[in-house]
Amino acid sequence: MRLAFVSPLPPAPTGIADYTVDVVRALNGPHSVELFHDQTNVAEALPAPAFPVAELPVRAAASAFDGVVYQMGNAPAHDFMYGWMERVRGVVVLHDLVLHHSFARRYLESREALAYAADPSDPGRKVEADRAHQSFLSAIEAVYPGLGERLKDAHFNTTGDLLPYAFPLFEPALRSARAVGAHNAFMIEAIQEARPDLDCVRLAMPVPLPSLAEGTAAAFRAKHGLAEAHWVVGCFGLVTREKRIETVARAVARIAEVHPDVRLLLAGPVSDNVWLGDLLARTRVSGRAVVTGRLDDREFAAAIAAADAVVHLRYPTARETSAALLRVMAQGRPVIVSDIANQAEIPDDVVRRVDPIDEEGGLVRSLEFLRRHPEEAVAMGGRARRFVETSHSLARTLETYERLLKPPAPR
C-alpha cells in the first residue's frame, strides 16, 4: 500500500513524533510511506520522505494514497490536524483519549481570541473573540449537552484544571474518520461506546529490543557523575507534572535519609525548567538529581540501562499507552507504575503498582522493596522484557496496522 502519515516528526516535543518514526520503520518494505508535517524543521535521518502538510492534497491528486493515517494526540504539536482530518479523510490513530485541551486550543487560542487578549479595549476584537468562544461552546454542547459553560470556565481557571480529564472530548477528532486505532483496551472500549459505527483496532506499539554494548551503563553514569555505588531511580520521557515528579522527588528525599547513595535521574525533555528547578530545590534533592534534557535514541537507551529502578507514574492521565514505559520494560528494568485502568493489561508480575490514593507512601515502599531484593528486581525486569517482546514487537505492529488499514467491512 501507498500510505500518507500525518504526524509531528522529530524534533517536535511529543513522544508521538518518535513513535511515528518507529511505525514507519515497521511498515517499510511491504508498504511505501510518505510523511506530512506542520513544522519549520524536521530531523534529517527519517525513514521516509517528508513534506509540508499543505502538499498532501497535491500529492494525493497526482497519485492516490491507499490510506491516510493521522497520528493524533493532546499536545500542541498535533493541533494542526483538525482541519486536515476533515479535509482529507483517513484513519485516526488516537494516542490520547483526552483531547479536550487540544480541541479547546482551536478556539480559545485562535487568532481572534489572542488578538482580543492583546487589546481587550477593542470592541471589534471582542466580537470576533466572542464568536470563537461561542463556536467552542457549541462544539462542547454537541458532545456534552448542558455542560458547555462549565467546561469553558475550566479553561479560564475558574473551576480547576482536572475537569477536562473527566470530559475527554475526543469525538470531534473522529468525526470524519474511516476507522480508528488505539493502544489499550480502556481506550478501545470508550471509543466503541461513543462511535459503534467505526471499525476500531487495538494496535501494538513498535518497541525495538536494544542490544547495548558492554559498559554502556557505566559510561553513561561516569559521564553524568553517577558512581557505581549509587542506587539510581530513573524517570524517562517528557518531564511533566503529570508524571508525578514531585512525588518521586519526595520519595527519593525520604529514602536518602536512610540511604544517602540514592540518586534521581530525569532523562528526557523538560516541559518547564523553572518549575522543575523549584521542585527539586523545595524537595531537597537538587544535589542528588541528574537532569539530561532530550537525548537521542542511543543515549536514551544508555540512560535506561543506568537506572536501578524506574518510576513511571501518571495523574491525571489522558489514558494513553506510554511508549517510554514500554521502552524501559524492553530493556528489562524493574518499573513502578500507577495503578490505573488504562494500564490494567500489563501483567501484575511484570511491574509494581502504586495506588494513587497512597502515592508517595506506596512509592517509597516499592522502591525500598526493589532495593532490598535485587534478585526480584532483575527477575521482574526479565518478565517485563518478555512481555514487550511478545506484545509490542515490530512484527505485531505491522500486523495490527495492516488490520487497521484494510477496507472496512460492509455494515
Model regions: which residues?
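A short, well-ordered alpha-helix in the C-terminal region of glycosyltransferases
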Residues: L238, E376-T390, T397, R403
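Nucleotide-activated donor-binding/catalytic signature segment of Leloir-type glycosyltransferases, i.e.
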Residues: L276-A301
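Short hydrophobic beta-strand element within catalytic cores of glycosyltransferases
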Residues: V310, A330-V337
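A short helix/loop element that forms part of the nucleotide-sugar donor recognition site in Leloir-type
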Residues: L212-L226
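Glycosyltransferase donor-sugar binding loop
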Residues: T40-N41, F236, R263-G277
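A short, active-site helix/loop in glycosyltransferases that binds the activated sugar's phosphate group
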Residues: H101-S102, G160-C200, V207-L209, E345
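Conserved donor-binding/catalytic core segment of Leloir-type glycosyltransferases
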Residues: A227-K243, A249-V252, L265
